[in-house]
Every structure is written in C-alpha cells, then in structure tokens.
Amino acid sequence: MEIETDQSIEAMDTQDTQEVEILTSDLQQTQQQRNSPPQLPKFKNLIQPQLHAVGAVTQLPSENGNMPPQQLLADSSSTSFGDGEAMGIDDESKEDQFRSETTFSFTVENVVQLKSQRLSPPVYVRMLPWRIMVIPNDRALGFFLQCNGENDSPTWSCNAIAELRLKCHKPDAQPFTRARIKHLFYSKENDYGYSNFITWQELKDSEKSYVHNNSITLEVHVVADAPHGVLWDSKKHTGYVGLKNQGATCYMNSLLQTLYFTNSLRLSVYRIPTEADDSSKSVGLSLQRVFHELQFGDRPVGTKKLTKSFGWETLDSFMQHDVQEFLRVLLDKLESKMKGTILEGTIPGLFEGKMSSYIKCKNVDYNSTRYETFYDIQLNIKDKKNIYESFQDYVAPETLEGDNKYDAGVHGLQEASKGVIFTSFPPVLHLHLMRFQYDPVTDSSIKYNDRFEFYEHINLDRYLAESENTLADYVLHAVLVHSGDNHGGHYVVFINPKADGRWFKFDDDVVSSCRKQEAIEQNYGGMDDEISFHAKCSNAYMLVYIRQSELDRVLGDITESEISSDLVERLDLEKRIEMARRKERGEANTYVSVHVILEENFEEQHKRRLFDLEKVHPRVFRIKQNQTVDELVDLFVRGFGVSRQRMRMWNLCTAQTQKFSHFDFVAEGSRTIEQISTSQKPWVIWLQLAWTDVPGPLPPFNPKTESLLFLKYYDPRNKRLNYIGCTQQPHTRRLIDLVPDVNSKLGFEPDTELTIYDEYADKKLVNLNEPIESALFIPQDHLQGHILIFERENVDAKLDLPTVGDYFLDLVYRIEIIFSDKCNPNEPDFTLELSNRYNYDQLANAVAERLNTDPQKLQFFMCINNYKETAGNAVPYTFKGTIKDLVSYTKQSSTKRIFYQRLSLSIHELDNKKQFKCVWVSSDLKDEKELVLYPNKNDTVKGLLEEAAKKISFAENSRRKLRLLKISNHKIVAVCKDDIPLDTLLKSNESITTAQGAQKTFRIEEVPAEDMQLAENEFLIPVAHFSKELYNSFGIPFLTKARQGEPYGALKQRIQRRLNVQDKEWENYKFCVISMGHNADVNDNTPVDLEVYRSWTSGQLPFFGLDHINKSRKRSSLNFSEKAIKIYN
C-alpha cells in the first residue's frame, strides 16, 4: 500500500501486518521449523530437474534463479532440467503474467533418496514468482508454497489462498491434499505450507501409487490478491487507479471511489463553479482535482489537499471516522456548494428517496401520517438471513396494544398499527448494513459479523406504497467492506463500474480485477472458510445499488470535452508547477537559482529600502553550476530582449542593508557559476537596464571614483514614498547639485527648494556642500547603493504625515491585519496594512473603503486564538483605544486578525440596542442555527421574542408563538418568563457557573400547538439525553407535556413519536427522573407525579432522563479527542 507522506514513503498497511492464522496443528511457518536452514539455492547449484513446459516455462532460469516474466510462454515443447519437472496449467491466458490464479506442478525425481531442499522454477501470478518448495525431514515430506523468495525488500506483501496436492498415478484417483492454506506473504514470511505434509510410510505405500518410477508430482492451485509495495501498475492492469492512504483514511478512500464511479455525480462535481476559489480551501475544487486525476492519471492519487480543504488538522485525517456520517456530511457540503447554480437539485435528484411514517388506529377513525425524505437506508442485519428479510423488517407494522397503546388525543389510548412504507426509491440507493450496534450486555457498541446475503439484482416493488412508473429493479454497483472490529480496521471497496458484471477491488493505492464471487458472496460475513481471502471479521457494511432504468444516466461515460476547459487548464497548470518544483528539488545540487531584480521592483516599494525580499517577485533563472557567466548573460539577453551593452549586473551583498557591488560580467565571462557564485542561496542580483527612452549603451561605471545613488521622493499628500530612479555620480560632486535634476524628474520648477535625507543615516543631511564621498561617508570597500530621499520644504503642517520623518515613524507602527467576515465564512479574507495607532473611526473608514460600504454599518470583533481562530467580543464604536489594543494579545509572529460584520442598521442605532445571541431549534429538534438579535436595551423577554419572530420562517398554519429557554450542558435549566428584563437575564447567566464550567446558552423555539393550553393537571417537564452517567449528557433537550397520574408508559410513547425512534432501538433506552442530583428509575406503570417537577425552587431543574448510547459520537479508541465530523470550508 502506498502511504501518502511528505516524502511519499511506501509502507505496508497496518491491517496487512496482522498475525496469520494457523489452520491446523502441523501447518507452520518453515522459518520456525527448520534447524539451521540453508540459503535458498540458486538453480545452477541444484541437481538439474526436468521441465516439461505445459503452458509454463520454456527457458532455463536466470543466473539468480528467477525466471523473467517475459519467458513465461505458452509452448508445448519440453526442455530438460534433470531429475524433476514443473508444469503450469492456467485456465486463463497463458501469457498473462498479471493473472490472479493458476495451477502449476513440480515433478521431483529420485524422491526416495531426497535429502535436501528443492525449489521448482517460478510461475508468475500477480507479477510475482511463485515456487513449490520441498523440504524432507526424518518422518515426513514438507510441502510449501513460496512467493517472491529472492526479494528482500520489507515493503512488499501479497495475500493468497492455495491448495497443495500430491498427485496419484492411479487412473481417476483423487490427489492427496490437506486443508487449504491462507497466508499473507511478505519478506519475513515468504513461504507457507506443511512441514509434515505426508509421512514417508504413507508416501511409499505402493497401494496408493503416489510414487512412480521413483518420482512424485506435486501440484498447487493458488489464488492471489494484488500485491502491495511492488511495481503494480493498476492503470495498466485494470484501467483504473487507486488513492493513497494518509495513514488511516482507507475509510474515506473507499467512499471517494464509490462517489467517483457514480458518473453523473462526478460530472456535476466537475461543473461546480470554482474559478474564484482558493485552491487550498475549496472543497469543490479539491474534489474536482481528485476526480480528474482518478480519471486521467496513471498513478495513485493523493488526498492531502482534499482533507486540507476540509479544514481538518493532522489528527483528524489520521482518525477512523464513521463512514455513514462522513458520507452525509460530504454530500451536504456538495449540495450547499451547488445551491444557486444550475446544478441545484443534483444531490437529491440522485440519492433522495421518500417514505411515509404512519399510525393507524384499529377501532376509531384516527390516523397520523408524516412524509420524510432519505438519502440512505439503515438495514438491521441481526438475525436476518438476507437483504429482503431486512427490508421486510424495516416496513413491518408494529401493533400498539396493552400498556403500549397509542395516545389518540380525544379518543384516548387506542390499539393501533405503526410502521413505515416507501413512496419512492432514488436512482442511486445507499444501504448501510447495521454491523455496528449497541449491545446491552456489554453496554457498548459491537460489530456483528453474522452472515448476511445480498444479491447482484434485487427488486423492491413490494416495499412501495404504490408502484412507480418504472420497476424498482436495482443492480449492485459497489460493496464497501470493513475488516476488523468496532475499534478500527481496514476498508476496501469492490466496484462494478459499468454494472456489466466485471468487478474490481479498490484497496487504497492498489486496484485489481476480481471474481464476482469475491466481491459478493465472500463478503456476506460469518465465514472463515478455505476459499475466501476474508476472515470472519471481514464483511460488507454498505451497499450501493443503481436503478436499472437509470443506468445509462447515472453511469454514462464522461469525456474530457464535457469538462470545463478552464478547469482542465487550471489543474494542468497546478500539475506542471508541482512537477517543476519536484524537478527543481531533484536538481538542487547541480543548478543555481539566480533571482533577478529590476528597477520596476523598486517602484513597487513604498517603505524603507528598495525592495522586500519576502514580497518581491524576481525573475528566476536556473543555470548549471558548470556553465559560464557568458552563458548566464546570454540567458539575460534572450530573456529581457536587450543587448549586453545596455545592461549592468550588481551583486546584492547583504539582504539587510541592501548594498550592492558592481559585477563585471565582461571580465568574469569565462568563469563558471560555481566559481563566482556567493554563499547566498539563491544568488540575488540587480540587473540594471538602460531606460528605453535613452538610446545607446549604459555609460561606463568606475567604482573607485563614482557612487551609485538611488533617489526617492516623499509625497505628503498621498503619504507615499516613491522611487524616482538611480544615478551614478563622481565622488567629487556635491549633493546639492542633484536638486535641479530631481526637480526636473518631478516636474517642479528648477528653483524649488528640496530637503535631502540619507535613508540609512535616518536624518537630514546638513553637509550638502561637501563632496559626495565625505557627505555620505562612502566606505573603503566601495559598496554601492546609498538611498537619498527628497522632500519639498514648507509643506502644509495640517497634513496627517507632512514630513518623511513623520512617515517613517508611521511605518514603525504599521501592521498587516487579516479581515474575516464573521457571518459568512465562505467570503474570502482580505489584508490591509494599517497603523496600530488608528482609532476606531480610522479602522472603520479603511475597511469600509475596501468593502465599498458605509463605515457606520460595520461592526468589529476581536479574534480569539484558540484551536481555530474565532470571533470574540464585539468592539463598541465608542472604543477609545487603538488597533494595537485589539491585537496586542497575539504573539509577535502570529497572524493579526479582526472579524467584521455588515449591519442592516447603523452602529449608532445599535448603541440603543442589545446584542443577544441565541440558538433557534426547529420543531423536529434536528436543526439548530445561531440567531443574533438586537432588541432594545431595556427590553424584556417578550420584546426579544418579537424581534426573533421577524427572522424566523413559520409554517402557514403556525400560531407564531415562541418561548425562550436557558440551556446548560445539554439540559434545560430555566424556562424564561416573558416579563423578565433582558439585563437581569444576561447578568444572571454571567454569574452562574457549573462545576464543570459548562457554557450556558439561550434557545428560542416555537411552542407546539398542544403546549398552548395546559390544564390544572398538566405541566411541561424537561427531557434530556445522557449516556450511562448524568454528566455524559448530549443532544438537544426539550419540553414535553405530562399529566398528573398518567403512566410513564404513555409519556414515553409520546416522546418516542416526537424523536422518531424505531421500536427496536427504543427497547435499548432506559428512563429515570432526575431531581436534586438523584435519579429514580421508572417503569411503564409508574404514575407521573408532577409535584416532583413543580416543587423546584433552586439548583438544577428536575428533568426526565433518557439513558442511551450517543450515536452522534464517532467510534474511536482515542476518546479524549472524539468529536463529530465537520467539513469546515
């Protein structure tokens, strides 16, 4: 298996290194049984065996004993090898060295006198050499199968099953055989078999006729899986490529292959608009990249960029996630990316089916029906023989009777039938087999490996309420398989890409063809027989079926012409850049990178110095170290289109001071780059080019008598420091003599007074009438590149930064800040360079100018630097501090980030409002979303709910009544009355903390119609979920109506209906009443005592507890880091 790492190191899958199973007591590894085993003999040292090539070997082995693959020919001729022969019998093409199975034999002569190990010539299966190995001992004959015996590499492995046979020379007699062997062959265990295959006494028994003319014939039938860690070309052998494993992402790889071969989905993914997306954060673009490489690439495809686009950290990628949850999250993300485009509706159009849940009373005319959609179906497999029994169990009606009667409102408790029926099935049907279920005995989730049959073709018409326009005939498209237990394991997928019966196995980076039996029957589970690669713990956990009538649409071929040319060009460019980087890394020792800076780079710099090495975009030339300076200059001539006479080279001596030394490429022309290049990597030079409006060559430069000066001008009105050119001046000239030339460059009057500064001296020059050499303190080593800054005298003092000194001081305080939209994470971030002395108004004006909006309709939030940077407290518009105060808590090297939010009202209007964050929960308790409301500061809960009603979409028949709840640690701690002032509510929320430090939130929800009116004997009681211990609470708590004295059985029935929990799952729930920290178990006949809930005065609000397993939590052995799967971008 190819492990995807930064170094692309190949290593074996951990699943592949599991212990092998000993099939019988005398079936052992030869390495453990031999006493001082000899080195594997080479063929030239053997007593030459005789070889009859019956579809096997026609030439002598090579010097090292290996038979080259090209020498495996279908030939009926024979070649003599001495006292033995090997025969290959292959039902498939005899020239196919990539075949998955074959039968071959080896005749051993002089067997009675056999004293040493014998090896047969190799026969190739899956591109690996397989040999029969014979090892005699005192009591019996040892018979082994060897794989790839000459290869000492630790990375290869191959899984195989084989039958070892001793042929009988009697007509129509059956060969002698032992139990089939099943083994993972790798470098340390490259042979497997029986050390005591048959005793000498039994072998020599003349009645059994095993020995004929002092010879025996041994035969092997071997079936091998595709090998890992060898040069296995999946594309060549199958036409498909695999996916690299990041360490524990085989669960994701199998699912991605399944989605890739859902061709209509793949085509829609190609068409997602991603032109403006950030390549590192776009899930759509990353999936496009993976699909495109799978379709057109020749090598296994990496997924690191995809998981990075998910926003996953390293730990997330190396954890085994729940596959069903990951599939749902990924499809939801794709569906959201397609909204608002022509692709909207693609996901439900492929995967969405519909069902109705019903309750029908037997004795009164009262029915309840609810219609739902689904993207997948969970089938119970426990105690079920096959897929039809599971579907029948899914739709089987349940009778509600006795203590479990249905509460039919005004009709009271009634006997009823309850069940579901499908109304339509989707084109692509995802079936999740419930291999992992809660076990009440162990009180944990376990994996069921029971045998469960599924079929290549199924019909589901009998499970529909009414027949659809086309038959519900389905063809099996993919079988996703898990090997292991509930703590982890390995995932592979078998796919029938064209639904034509040709199956392929996708095992991370290795793809191989396989038999239909291996893809289907051998994944039923409950087997550990001799004909299957799979152990008992290896079985199907998910099936993908495609509707027969939709095959052409779902599996239609996709050509490159159907993919956007812009996308193809972008992906090709990425690939070329990556290849160039790899090539550059590989040639780093033989090449030198020359970074060429031009004057245009100086013009981009408006700060100190001439350029910023971290931000400048130099022209890069790569040249071999043994090439000459003349050849480098020739590159410049061709690259810039200028003659040698119109260019001059300057070495950057130090990046810090940015001083240059003149490089005479004429004098140095014959020297090699290796001889003249500095220790600076890369080699940075400034290439001075003659100005296009100045004809002729550059004037000669004498570093002993001349100085190179760079000139800048400070523009106080635009607060910019502009580069205006360079000049070479004799040391004897005065600085004041430069003023007329500078005025001319700037278009000023010749007598305009200018002040001159030396940038490095960081002060105004006062000795302007002295020669340049003494005025600038030209050093003896003649480093060049003094920067002179000119500014006009008598500038308006009212300007923000009237002098260059003011400007430089401002630069000291400037920082780069990233601005992120708090409410819209998909909105691209932007960066502004601002002074950390800016006040709130200056900050708002700068951001508003960038966003082209009103600064009064922006609100800012400080950034919290936790696991992921998130928005913290809002910054009041009356804030008297500076930007420095907003970002000063971050580390010096950390990113400075501020969140912003666009407002629908002015920030001043907001001053009279109070921001109130809460959560809105839908009536089915499935959807949550954050609400940010702005009620008046002195408002009550009633005003808050009125404000919330403006932002909530109600159903047509809704009574539009809302209520506010306080939630802590997944429990309801208070039902807030309408007359409570919001100030009181918020202050009490801040002052109360729990022992666990649980965060309290407010929740707004619609009041159900049945809760509107409460009789004297009725009360709304809180309900909460927990697992085993009260502190392990989870999920969404809620209120439900209870009646004084009614049995808890009736209350539980109403809760089950509201939560839509299946009966079989509901049986695993436990129930108790929690009051004052104590819990009391209740049964169906226990009467409800409302005083327990009404008499609360302080502390935790009493609640009715549902104790059950937390299914939302992913299965992981690393409990400390368990969290739901999320795709952040």
Curated annotation (Swiss-Prot):
Biological process annotations from GO: negative regulation of hippo signaling; positive regulation of heterochromatin formation; positive regulation of smoothened signaling pathway; protein deubiquitination; proteolysis; regulation of protein stability
Catalytic activity as recorded in UniProt: Thiol-dependent hydrolysis of ester, thioester, amide, peptide and isopeptide bonds formed by the C-terminal Gly of ubiquitin (a 76-residue protein attached to proteins as an intracellular targeting signal)
Cellular compartments annotated: Nucleus
Record-annotated USP domain positions: 241-548
Coiled coil: none
Chain spans, region Disordered: 1-20
Annotated PROSITE patterns: MATH (PS50144), USP_1 (PS00972), USP_2 (PS00973), USP_3 (PS50235)
EC number: 3.4.19.12
Single GO MF annotation: cysteine-type deubiquitinase activity
Catalytic residues (UniProt): 250 (nucleophile), 490 (proton acceptor)
Transcription in keyword set: no
Role of this protein: Hydrolase that deubiquitinates target proteins.
Protein name as catalogued: Ubiquitin carboxyl-terminal hydrolase 7
Organism taxonomic ancestry: Eukaryota, Metazoa, Ecdysozoa, Arthropoda, Hexapoda
